[in-house]
Regions:
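Extracytoplasmic cell-surface/polysaccharide-interacting catalytic and binding patches
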Residues: 1-77, 81-194
Length: 194
């Protein structure tokens, strides 16, 4: 496994569509994307926000899935630094830091702060069960067509630093097709293309 949280770099351009936010690349505390928009309530649980381009593509994805009698909704989207700190601290308090580090990001290290990440759920509710749903099967095949990648795949924990999260998708735009076709993580894609 990589040395996560060891050589942390502050992200210089957090508005970049391909910004890499992970355990080694950190957003500054006050960063808030300037083009957050509310997701249509038909496609979200409560009030949720994504950056404009991601929101438009996510709503189209949900609308197209709905035509096939599938229900995909945003469970979690943009999170502030402060909110992520509360979540992470809660995990540490409840389960200890080793578990917290495997399944939650420290504040500043969460893609949710970019407004480009979305945790989804299907018609069967809770996103922890998402991999067992027909919505998941559809997402795996179709999300890249809308610019989304499965961000934390099953066999890539040593690269991403996070356990498998079948519900966590990241908007990257057109390169989603290439990333998915080549079975890459965002880390691997950027390492090979920058």
């Amino acid at each position: 496994m990589n040395d996560f949280y060891k050589n942390i770099k502050l992200i210089e351009n957090p508005d970049d569509l391909l910004v890499l936010v992970n355990k080694n690349n950190m957003l500054y505390q006050k960063f808030i994307p300037n083009n957050l928009e509310k997701i249509n309530e038909l496609y979200s649980v409560d009030t949720k926000y994504l950056r404009n381009e991601a929101k438009e593509c996510f709503e189209k994805l949900c609308k197209d899935a709905k035509k096939l009698n599938l229900s995909i909704k945003a469970e979690s989207t943009y999170r502030s630094f402060e909110y992520q700190k509360k979540l992470y601290d809660n995990y540490v308090l409840k389960y200890g830091s080793k578990y917290a580090n495997a399944c939650s990001a420290k504040p500043g290290h969460s893609e949710h702060q970019t407004g480009l990440a979305v945790d989804v759920r299907g018609s069967e509710g809770d996103y922890n069960n998402f991999s067992n749903t027909k919505e998941f099967s559809w997402m795996i095949k179709n999300a890249p067509n809308y610019g989304f990648i499965l961000r934390y795949p099953y066999d890539k924990q040593n690269i991403t630093g996070f356990k498998y999260e079948p519900w966590h998708y990241r908007y990257v735009g057109k390169i989603a097709l290439e990333i998915t076709k080549n079975n890459l993580t965002l880390e691997e894609y950027l390492e090979n293309n920058i």
